[in-house]
Amino acid sequence: VSLAEKGNEKANREYEQKIRTEKAANEKIHLQNRRTGMKNTDKDYFERFSFGDSPEMADELLALVLAGKKTATVSVILEDEQAPSVGDLSLVLDGLSTPACVIKTVHVETVKFCDLTWDMVKLEGEDENFEQWKSGNIRYWTRDAAKRGYTFTDQTPITFERFEVVKVL
């Protein structure tokens, strides 16, 4: 077997693996669409995520969502990431990455961190006052910035998203 043939065999194996991976991902999406009984109208997928940056935080924040206390979230959306849109359906995962509920985005607004207000962020349901929220989120986004390679300042654009639970799984 020549080197060229070995190279072609390797390329074919890699391509076949890519096709198997894509097929499995599509089957998972269709399974989740069947499981939830829902489908995004303009997308072939649900965004899947958990709130926070640890399994414990994901479970804690999910509990607030399911109790109706958390109806909004704030996030830093980097240039290469898709921002949420009104009407988007998202699959919220618990700390073990198990689907827990489907939420629908009902409002999206981007503001600088320094322009967020208590009326906005209290909808996150996590803190008792604005100063507590600010200090906790500065710590969170400082960790996030180090992981994702951006610089967090009070001028950082923040995406404020309100949502409603449309299905508990």
Predicted regions: what they are:
Residues 7-8, 149:
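Short, flexible coil/linker elements and helix-boundary hinge sites characteristic
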Residues 19, 23-37:
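Short, Lys/Arg-enriched N-terminal segments with co-localized hydrophobic residues
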